[in-house]
Amino acid sequence: MASGAPQNSSQMACDGEIPGFLDTLLQDFPAPLSLESPLPWKVPGTVLGQEEVEAELTELAMGFLGSRNAPPAVAAAVTHEAISQLLQTDLSEFKRLPEQEEEEEEEEERVLTTLLDAKGLSRSFFNCLWEVCSQWQKRVPLTAQAPQRKWLVSIHAIRNTRRKMEDRHVSLPAFNHLFGLSDSVHRAYFAVFDGHGGVDAARYASVHVHTNASHQPELLTDPAAALKEAFRHTDQMFLQKAKRERLQSGTTGVCALITGAALHVAWLGDSQVILVQQGQVVKLMEPHKPERQDEKSRIEALGGFVSLMDCWRVNGTLAVSRAIGDVFQKPYVSGEADAASRELTGLEDYLLLACDGFFDVVPHHEIPGLVHGHLLRQKGSGMHVAEELVAVARDRGSHDNITVMVVFLRDPLELLEGGGQGAGGAQADVGSQDLSTGLSELEINTSQRS
């Protein structure tokens, strides 16, 4: 799910945009899939836990429709309707019996969850998707044409010198459309996940955190609390999957949910988000690292230890103190996120979310100058600013995967007119309220308006 800069007005789907897309799609797929038909998109594994179905099939549909150049709001609305229809049906025909090996495990070790056949479920879902598209070709519901704020988001990610790309990111401007929220508050969600020990945990988090957030009762009243709980619940879900499939990976993560004139962020580990306002860095969060005294004390109180090797590590292994996954390092590596909220005044320039492959070599105070310099050279275009920031980190010696996402909160041309360069090393820590609250292997560059 990728996309993009807010304008002063909302965006509504053009009169012919939705029917035109549906006409083209249904020309290529004129009938539901038969049992012999190949699936048009990759299936998410061989089995799914019942609680995983909504998020995994949502990801499948958004990937498929995005590959067909569906407008993001249209893809989200169609996906939501198809998911809603599927979840009202009896899914018991897709139940899979446990493997013999799992049956023989000790009772206390057994992962008790209903497993469903992913391929059969995906085929049934594609046919729900086809049915919705056929219905909407005749008449598009008004809910699918609801206004959506326009965004400019610049994203760039590289594998760098690492053997595998373990980062994942999410850019979801059509949050309301995807989850059927019909109130007057515009919502957009952005996230970066930095995996380690494999990509499974990062991919899982990029699929499930926002879906879990959408189901939290606090989403409408306390969005930061909803994000915090979404991280915790996603960690619990992934730990079940990890035990079932013998996965050992983990992921840090950071996300931002913009709800009208408010910003809510949540984070786990050392991925970070900063806000730049009138050329000044506004500190929103403190990353979780083993060397932080409070983190070190928490780990030691649980019976673990923090040691300095090439860097500070938990129990001599992991260089992060909080993460989704890392099943064999729980509870020392915590799955409890922190969160914060702040009101937006309209003077904010942009958000920047990135993994430690960027922030380890590019200090916060340099970012406004780097972005401003890019905008000057590009005459106010911010489309490729993330690519330049990634290049800066790589040239400074970062060997890690690098992902950078810049979410503009004002038109980049306005930032040039206002001289948003920042004052050297100035950094503000303004009013943050702490609350209890598909990639290519080598590189991805996504910069678009939506």
From Swiss-Prot:
Biased composition (Polar residues): 433-450
Modified residues (Phosphoserine): S450
Domain PPM-type phosphatase: 152-409
Entry cofactors: Mg(2+); Mn(2+)
Residue sites binding Mn(2+) 2 per the record: D194, D356, D400
Function: Dephosphorylates and concomitantly deactivates CaM-kinase II activated upon autophosphorylation, and CaM-kinases IV and I activated upon phosphorylation by CaM-kinase kinase. Promotes apoptosis.
Protein name: Protein phosphatase 1F
Species name: Rattus norvegicus
